[in-house]
A protein has these predicted regions:
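Dynamic "connector" segments at or just before major functional cores
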Residues: 18-184, 191-211, 218-223, 227-228, ...
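Generic beta-strand/beta-sheet core signal
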Residues: 103, 161, 195, 207, ...
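Short amphipathic alpha-helical "interface-anchor" segments enriched in bulky aromatics
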Residues: 100, 334-373, 381-385
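Conserved short alpha-helical interface segments
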Residues: 1-19
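An anionic, glycine-rich sequence signature occurring as long contiguous blocks
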Residues: 25-45, 249, 254-350, 354-356, ...
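Acidic, metal-coordinating catalytic cores used for nucleic-acid/nucleotide bond scission
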Residues: 236-245, 264-267
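Basic, amphipathic alpha-helical segments enriched in Lys/Arg and hydrophobic/aromatic residues
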Residues: 361-418
Length: 467
């Protein structure tokens, strides 16, 4: 319009004043996150993230403030507040840091962290840059220390695995690894994870791994466990790609029991084919849900790097090729060995849940050390979900995404006043399970709320209209 008037010789129209402009929604300016501006003045509001407050009793019991003591922080956002805010993103299944902007105005999310407002995407991106591997390891060690009395990590046996997080950028520092989901090698960040076999929770992670260091990562986990628990891991289960035969000999020298697979080389396949039928014996597995419960087994002793190991050929497990198990457990029956290795699928299921719910494959950076902190958050968040699952009747084996869908994803009305914070969960079909968990029986004092207590309640049923 300005150009048309100019061509016709007219002067430009004067700019309208703000009060002359039409009334339409304009961008709002949200406050900057600052713990010093955190207020617990009496007020009421509604939050989309009501289910997050179900984790608060566990965070109080596990003393998150102590866990965050050695982490980086500032006067505006102290270390404990930064850790709670970062955990909130994981617990609420926020895929990328930029997606937090959709919840920037949610007062409930800020209250959970103990801040006046939730930090913005730029803060979360910058915060992980302040972590080195030593600090991330200290966070995991503190998490282990706080979980010692929770019964979640028994430490009897561990499932170990690598996971390659795909990278689609152009950074030359990102190395190529096997990505099992795509059955090919591509640029990716390699992550090592350890899972407690009984508690089904991750207990260790490391994303600061370069090519050539993979075989020794199992010993870094052993050193970590010894430092935090004062003893060596008792039993490890992993696949054939995790380490080398030389490292297996070292494990045997440390008297650590293990079960692993051996790669089916042409010579091994030839030996299996040449075995007479009478050499095989049938065992029955005590797994009622398994289709193939009567595999055939042949056992022998092999020497690798000067150490004797038990080697089991296993057929009729539902695979076209036989399975080759290798172990240093000399007194355990073949049936127990096969059953225990079959339970290694628990870490595969946990990795699937981590990818689908905790968005493990949504790479936060091309820098492995930044990914390292993100994986440590995954370890803590998955542990909190396992602890909550133990409280919920019928959900002890549920994966995080199932628990989130049924239990956590609930809005709530929050009222601050009278010396407490009252979180009134909206009605949902699974609300009776929360009521039966005991979380609503009594209030919990929350340290980062200046001594105020959290009281979880359920919204009353709608009263019938009177006519």
């Amino acid at each position: 319009m300005r150009e048309v008037l100019k061509e016709e010789g007219f002067a430009p129209l004067p700019r309208r004043l703000d009060e002359e402009r039409p009334d339409y929604p304009r961008p709002t300016v949200e406050p900057v996150a600052d713990a010093r501006a955190f207020s617990l003045e009496p007020r009421s509001f509604t939050t989309r993230c009501g289910g997050l407050f179900l984790f608060v009793p566990e965070l109080v019991r596990l003393d998150l403030e102590k866990m965050a003591a050695a982490l980086p922080g500032s006067k505006m956002i102290p270390a404990a507040h930064a850790l709670r805010a970062s955990l909130a993103l994981k617990l609420w299944s926020i895929e990328r840091k930029s997606h937090v902007m959709t919840l920037a105005a949610d007062e409930g999310l800020a209250l959970f962290a103990g801040l006046n407002a939730i930090p913005k995407k730029s803060y979360f991106s910058e915060y992980s840059s302040r972590f080195g591997h030593a600090q991330t390891t200290r966070l995991l060690a503190a998490w282990q220390e706080q979980l010692a009395g929770a019964g979640l990590l028994r430490g009897e046996s561990f499932n170990l695995d690598f996971h390659s997080v795909p990278y689609y950028g152009e950074s030359p520092q990102v190395e190529r690894h096997d990505v099992s989901a795509r059955s090919r090698r591509q640029a990716s960040v390699l992550v090592f994870l350890a899972q407690d076999a009984d508690g089904r929770a991750f207990c260790y992670s490391n994303a600061d791994i370069r090519k050539g260091e993979e075989a020794g990562e199992i010993f870094r986990f052993i050193d970590f466990w010894k430092r935090t628990r004062g003893e060596l891991p008792r039993h490890l289960v992993f696949d054939s790609r995790l380490t080398t035969y030389a490292k297996l000999a070292e494990l045997d020298g440390l008297k650590i029991d293990f079960i692993t697979l051996r790669r089916r080389s042409p010579q091994i396949m030839k030996d299996i084919v040449c075995l007479p039928r009478s050499a095989w014996r049938t065992v029955e597995l005590d797994i009622s849900t398994r289709k193939y419960r009567t595999p055939r087994v042949y056992e022998q002793t092999v020497r690798l790097h000067g150490h004797a190991f038990r080697q089991l050929y296993v057929q009729d497990l539902g695979h076209e090729d036989p399975t080759v198990l290798l172990t240093n457990q000399r007194r355990t029956s073949a049936k127990q060995l096969i059953t225990r290795y079959a339970h290694r699928m628990l870490i595969e299921n946990a990795l699937s849940d981590a990818v689908r719910f905790f968005h493990m494959d949504a790479l936060s950076s091309a820098v492995g050390l930044k990914v390292d902190f993100d994986m440590a958050l995954l370890v803590v968040a998955s542990g909190l979900y396992r602890l909550l699952a133990q409280r919920m009747r019928g959900y002890s084996d549920a994966q995080a995404r199932h628990l989130f869908r049924d239990i956590i994803d609930i809005p709530a009305d929050i009222t601050i006043g009278g010396g407490e914070v009252r979180v009134q969960l909206h009605r949902r079909s699974h609300l009776p399970i929360i009521l039966a968990s005991g979380l609503m029986d009594q209030p919990f004092a929350v340290p980062w709320w200046n001594g105020l207590s959290l009281r979880l309640t359920a919204r009353d049923a709608l009263k019938p209209r009177q006519t």
